[in-house]
Amino acid sequence: MSTTVETARSSVIVAIDGPSGTGKSSTSKAVAAKLGLSYLDTGAQYRAITWWMLTNGVDVGNPEEIATAAAKPVIVSGTDPAAPTITVDGEDASGPIRTQEVTSKVSAVSAVPEVRTLITALQRSIAAAATGGIVVEGRDIGTTVLPDADLKIFLTASPEARAARRSGEVKGSDLSATREALIKRDAADSGRKTSPLAKADDAVEVDTTELTLQQVIECVVTLVEGKRVAA
């Protein structure tokens, strides 16, 4: 009987949303690893389909062309938080999807409804298959992808803090330019008609501006453990 209870408690689904530079990926991976949960970076999937389109000559400025090509690539995400993977048509895409070119085009591609429908279905299938529980990070997880998640968390931070973190991740990047790029991405993601970046009404908001990564991780772990106990 106790084993069944433990399984029920461990199979929690956690949705972590928020804009770039708030610590979503680092926090989500660390929390999943610490609690023995699977991990899914949904942003990587949108980057992957964007990279595929750029590589295959799709005009990413043309929504109709994007919609027509959306179902062609086969995207597979590995959910081990210690070593998450992503492949496109069997090819490792973990490096190529992080280029500046992909970063500058991903919002346009991900705003196309046909793309979001396909990727959302993929994300839901991965979450459903994670019988031991999963941490899913993105921009519309709590509102659109997994509205029935056991716990929804929305990470925020000031534009300055986010830009500083992003600049630290990318060698030679300009802080001011990074800040402007983040603000532009926020506007694009929040303003799109299909599944915009938004905080779910029942999400717990965590402002990470003045917190260290470890403090954010500890905060989220506490929230997840509290949800498990209440389950």
UniProtKB/Swiss-Prot annotation:
Q: What is its EC number?
A: 2.7.4.25
Record's subcellular location: Cytoplasm
From the record, give the cysteines joined by S-S bonds. Answer: none
> Which GO terms label this protein's molecular function in UniProt?
ATP binding; CMP kinase activity; dCMP kinase activity
Primary location = cytoplasm
* CDD domains named in the record: CMPK (cd02020)
BP terms from Gene Ontology: nucleobase-containing small molecule interconversion; pyrimidine nucleotide metabolic process
Specify which residues bind ATP according to the UniProt entry for this protein. 18-26
What InterPro entries does the entry give? Cytidylate_kin (IPR003136), Cytidylate_kinase_dom (IPR011994), P-loop_NTPase (IPR027417)
| Key words, A-Z | ATP-binding, Cytoplasm, Kinase, Nucleotide-binding, Transferase
Signal sequence segment: none
- Any single Gene Ontology cellular-component annotation: cytosol
> Which reaction(s) does the protein catalyse, per the Swiss-Prot or TrEMBL entry?
CMP + ATP = CDP + ADP; dCMP + ATP = dCDP + ADP
Q: Name one Pfam family in it.
A: Cytidylate_kin
Q: Which domain of life is it from?
A: Bacteria
**Record keywords: Flavoprotein included?**
no
> PANTHER family in the record, alphabetically?
CYTIDYLATE KINASE (PTHR21299:SF2), CYTIDYLATE KINASE/PANTOATE-BETA-ALANINE LIGASE (PTHR21299)
Query: According to its UniProt record, which protein family does this protein belong to?
Result: Belongs to the cytidylate kinase family. Type 1 subfamily.
Q: What is this protein called?
A: Cytidylate kinase
Q: Which gene encodes it?
A: cmk
